[in-house]
Structures are given as structure tokens and as C-alpha cells.
Amino acid sequence: MSMSKIDSADWIKIDLHIHTLDDPKDVIDYSAHELLERAKQLGFGVLAITLHDAVFERAEVFADAAAIGILLIPAAEVRLEGADIILLNVSAAEVAGLKTFEDVRQLRARRGLSIFIFAPHPFYVLGGSIGERLLEEIDCFDAIELCHFHKGLLNPNRRAAKVAARFGTPMIATSDAHQLHAFGRHYTSIPRPRELTIENVFEALRKSPLRLTSPPASIVDLASAIYWIFLAHPFKLRKTQRRGPTHTTPSCSSGLESKSQT
């Protein structure tokens, strides 16, 4: 076995900011099981489905993830006082009780190291970014996100990196995937723990060296993002609002392939 393969085997790929069609806010066209299929193909070990203002809690998806060796962490992307934050290993009841950053501090005081909170896309002008307020609320966060959308001079992550260095806060790369093809290129790698548990993943994120994979956006990526943000998604959202919510029925067949619509 080559040294590169040995080295790769000692690390686990994780993505802690992903959306699926379960999202109550955005119109997503791929399912949690389709995400699991792709994650397995690409060798991911840890995922978090971060619905907007809701905790992903579908027990069958957690069971199916575990069956293929993927640790799925319950999570949510919550907007507080106009700013998005991502909370990992939280319950729906805990998220429902969050209205202010002071509530976040109280939650952290109760839960300690058993939760992990990071600031997504903090200095991007769209999408509920926390902006300069991050400096005031930095004690609420365990990490700062390295946003996937960057190219050349278009890179607000530079400001995020300065804040992270100033406060000694780790940065983590994520995909923030809203389309399935966007998943898999932007992620964080952690040293492989002896046992793959939420506790060990959080400890690695806080204390271990991290590898961040986040290549610059290509011209195709830029065009796709602009099309999605300003054309495709607003159209799908209006169409869904006119039609009303729809629900899919889980398949009774076995295997992830049979569950790709859920």
C-alpha cells in the first residue's frame, strides 16, 4: 500500500452543513437517502443535515447512515437576531427555545462540550450572515465556517480567517450543499478516532489538526450558483408555495437505492 493511501486511511472526511428536500425553507431537489448514497461513494464518515430552523430527526435515515458506516449528527441551521448559526447534536426542543444569543450561551452552559456550534458564511452579504457581530458573539461559537463559494478576490473567507486567528477559533470547510452535485468537493478531514462517536468528532474538531478542502469556484460553479440563487430557487419556491407542501411515501423496498425519494 502506498504512503498516500495509508495517510488517507488515517483521516475521515466530514461535512457538517448540508440541506436536503426535508428543508422547510429552501426548495431542495435531492433526498437524504440520495445524499447518503453519494456520501458513501465519496468516502465520507460524518455528516450533518442542517435544515433551516428545524432539526433533522428522521430515525430511519439515521439508522441507514449507521448501517453504511456514516455517523449522522442531529443538527439545524437557525436564524437568531438576523444571523444564521449551526448547532450540532441538539434536539428540536432545544432549538425551539433559542431566540437570542443569550439563549445560546445558556444552552452552552447546560450542555458543555456535548454540543458544537459554528458560524456559517459569516462575512458573505447574502443569506443571513452574522458579519462583524461575530466579534461580539464569538464566545457562542466553537468554530467558523470556511464558505465554499470563493474565487480570487471574491473571498470573504479572508476576513473569517483573521477573526479565527485572533480568537484561536478553528475553521471548518463545508459544502452548504443545496444541490447534490455541490456535495463532496468542500469538506473537513479529521484524524480517525478509535471509535466514531459524536463526542470524539467534537473533540477532534476542537483539539486536533484539521485538513480543509475547499477549491476555488470554477466558472461553471459561479454560473450555477448565480442561476440557482437568482432564478431557479425563487421560481421553485413560488411554485411550491402555490401548490402547497407535498409529502413522499417511503419505499418498502430494502437498500438505499429504494429510498432515494425520501
Placement of each model-derived feature along the sequence:
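Charged catalytic cores and adjacent phosphate/nucleic-acid-binding surfaces used
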Residues: M1-L16, T20-E37, R58-F62, A66-P74, ...
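Divalent metal-dependent hydrolysis catalytic cores, especially in the metallo-beta-lactamase
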Residues: L36-F56, F116-F118
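Short, well-ordered beta-to-alpha junction loops that form the rim of enzyme active sites
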Residues: H52, P120-P122, S175-A177
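Aromatic-lined carbohydrate-recognition surfaces of secreted/lumenal glycan-active proteins
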Residues: S114-G127
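Glycine-centered short loops/turns at secondary-structure junctions
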Residues: G43, G69, G112-S114, G168
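Short, charged N-terminal beta->alpha structural module
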Residues: E102-G112
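Short acidic (Asp/Glu) patches
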Residues: L98-K99
